[in-house]
Amino acid sequence: MIRSSCTMGLAETLRPAKKVPTVWWSSPNPMSLNPNRSTMVILIVGEFIFGLGDSLLIAAGVGNTPWTVLAEGIALTAEVWTIGEATFLVSIAVMFLWIPIKETPGIGTILNIIIIALTIHVMVPILPQTENFLVSILMASSGIQLVGIGSTMYLTANLGPGPRDGWMTGLQRATGVPIGRVRITIEVSVLVIGIVLGGTF
């Protein structure tokens, strides 16, 4: 009986969530302009952790996310921007794509644009570049974990999605296409454009 209860509890824990869970720090109103201090702290720390994780992935040199490939491609093409600055510009551009689908940004959306790009801009130049494959794998693994932790923190704050997530969910709502197909279409398109511009993955 105890084993059965433990097994069911584990299964519930590992079951994919259909929506972002509500926790004690979640804002009851995603459009709030005056959220609780604890909510803001967790939001900001989460977005910093996300940016740090993305920075580790970039520094590891063993593979980037599609959006980072695009930012790197833009930075290499322009030759005047860092990846962090290009990430900021991409986020702003994606925000304009919210207009036709009538998405509304929250405080978390705006801070996402600023904090993640700033963290990448500051951290990538100071993180070690290594030719040791095992160290690179360790850095990449740590980066993936930090991105997951950071995402969980800022999404559960419920103060607005990041520009990319908001565009994805907005397109799904506007078109009725399953979210998985929307995500794959967006990320493959972004990846191809990034590669054409010279980004690496």
Which residue ranges define each predicted feature?
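Core subunits and conserved enzymes of cellular information-processing
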Residues: 2-201
